[in-house]
């Protein structure tokens, strides 16, 4: 199994495209992470929108550049709105991304996520346990936390990618991004990133935005992982713990965009 690396030039090119196109991202995400997700997208140059009412969600999915479905705080009314948005996204050819939070631990969201797979997401982003559960290989995880190493989920990610046509991202100490054939590994980041709620969910929003960019979607999505890890490393070097990490992280994302424009 060959795992390729992403070059700095590829990452910089994707970030230039990101800033140039400034995707409008319809984020149907969980209640815990909305502000952090919106600020992450803004720092990178995208435009976030959090539209959740069923009728509006369907309407907005038709005009957005990309759609994110994150099931972290799933309810039946929210599932109805998400389903309507995904149906409209498919009809309007709006590329959408699934973040199957805790899908291995809870039946309702697992069935819902499996239902959504028939609408062909452009990307799926989860930790190892979530990706393995979604692929039907295991029902693991401890709530939103993984109990598996990212590398162990690569075969499941490849299978899921081939079955759905999605780019699948497995996040961990090393992030792995695959289209079912090629695999890109992204090293970096810092363990402190796991002590801040929302870094993974925010990454899913950036992944969704990258799916709207022209060019190689696999490389664009892998670049999203690279930017987040880069920013995490820079933020950790300047912070004293989780509380001071967040503002430094947002600053680091902003600085990355300034560097590619210089």
UniProtKB/Swiss-Prot annotation:
InterPro entries per the UniProt record, alphabetical: Hyethyz_kinase, Ribokinase-like
Keywords tagged on the record: ATP-binding, Kinase, Magnesium, Metal-binding, Nucleotide-binding, Thiamine biosynthesis, Transferase
GO process terms (BP): thiamine biosynthetic process; thiamine diphosphate biosynthetic process
Bridged cysteine pairs (disulfide): none
Cofactor (UniProt): Mg(2+)
One Pfam family from the record: HK
Domain of life (superkingdom): Bacteria
Gene3D superfamilies: 3.40.1190.20
Pathway: Cofactor biosynthesis; thiamine diphosphate biosynthesis; 4-methyl-5-(2-phosphoethyl)-thiazole from 5-(2-hydroxyethyl)-4-methylthiazole: step 1/1
Name this polypeptide is given: Hydroxyethylthiazole kinase
Name of the gene: thiM
């Amino acid at each position: 199994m060959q795992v390729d690396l992403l070059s700095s030039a590829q990452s910089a090119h994707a970030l230039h495209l990101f800033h140039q196109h400034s995707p409008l991202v319809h984020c149907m995400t969980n209640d815990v992470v909305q502000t952090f997700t919106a600020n992450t997208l803004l720092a990178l140059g995208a435009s976030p929108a959090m539209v959740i009412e069923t009728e509006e969600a369907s309407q907005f999915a038709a005009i957005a550049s990309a759609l994110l479905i994150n099931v972290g705080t799933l309810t039946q009314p929210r599932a109805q709105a998400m389903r309507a948005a995904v149906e409209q996204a498919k009809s309007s050819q709006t590329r959408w991304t699934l973040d199957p939070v805790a899908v291995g631990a809870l039946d309702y969201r697992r069935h819902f996520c499996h239902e959504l797979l028939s609408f062909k997401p452009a990307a799926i982003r989860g930790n190892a346990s979530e990706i393995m559960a979604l692929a039907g290989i295991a029902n693991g995880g401890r709530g939103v936390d993984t109990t598996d190493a990212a590398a162990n989920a690569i075969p499941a990610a490849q299978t899921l990618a081939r079955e759905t046509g999605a780019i699948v991202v497995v996040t961990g100490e090393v992030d792995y991004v695959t289209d079912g054939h090629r695999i890109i590994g992204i090293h970096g980041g810092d363990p402190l990133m796991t002590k801040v709620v929302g870094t993974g969910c925010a990454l899913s929003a950036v992944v969704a935005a990258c799916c709207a960019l022209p060019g190689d979607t696999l490389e664009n999505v892998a670049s999203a992982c690279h930017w987040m890890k880069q920013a995490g490393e820079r933020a950790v070097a300047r912070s004293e713990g989780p509380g001071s990490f967040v503002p430094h992280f947002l600053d680091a994302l902003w600085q990355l965009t300034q560097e590619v424009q210089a």
